[in-house]
Amino acid sequence: MLCHNPNNSDVARRKRDPAAVAAAAPVGSIDFKVMIHKIHRGENLEQQPYLIYGFGPPPLNYGINDFGEVRFPGDLRICTTCHAPGTYLLPPFPGTALGTQVAHLEPGTGNLVVDGRLGPIRSVCTSCHDGDDAVAHAETMTAPDGAEACAVCHEEGRDFAVSILHAGRN
């Protein structure tokens, strides 16, 4: 994807907001796998508000989109509403998938400061499961070099496979 890839954020628009720069605000990922899951989860996200800066009218040329009020028109547990059967399951290895860049704005300058990268599995899982406990669990199961151990419990055939956790819902 050209725009909504793991390396992109809303920094180009966010840094035009003096309040965001002054607060050294974390930038919002526009990585499709993260953004679309967060938007669909909307009002059910534990971390609120969910703000993404986007295009807006002159002279500011930015707009603030608050997706924290979005209500998905269905049961979020039914992954096959959007996903083809089986494509939402955790693969044993992430393969060539890129993790999502994490960054913030430098106070005063508005320059982008890259803090690191979340692994691809952690990125998508914590998009919906964004509470402190879930985020801590994902962090604990990620090695310092970024290797993710999620498949130990969550791949198919394991006790806590995604298909089991969503049993009867897909």
Predicted regions and their residues:
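Flexible linker/context regions in extracytoplasmic redox proteins
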Residues: M1-R71, T80-N170
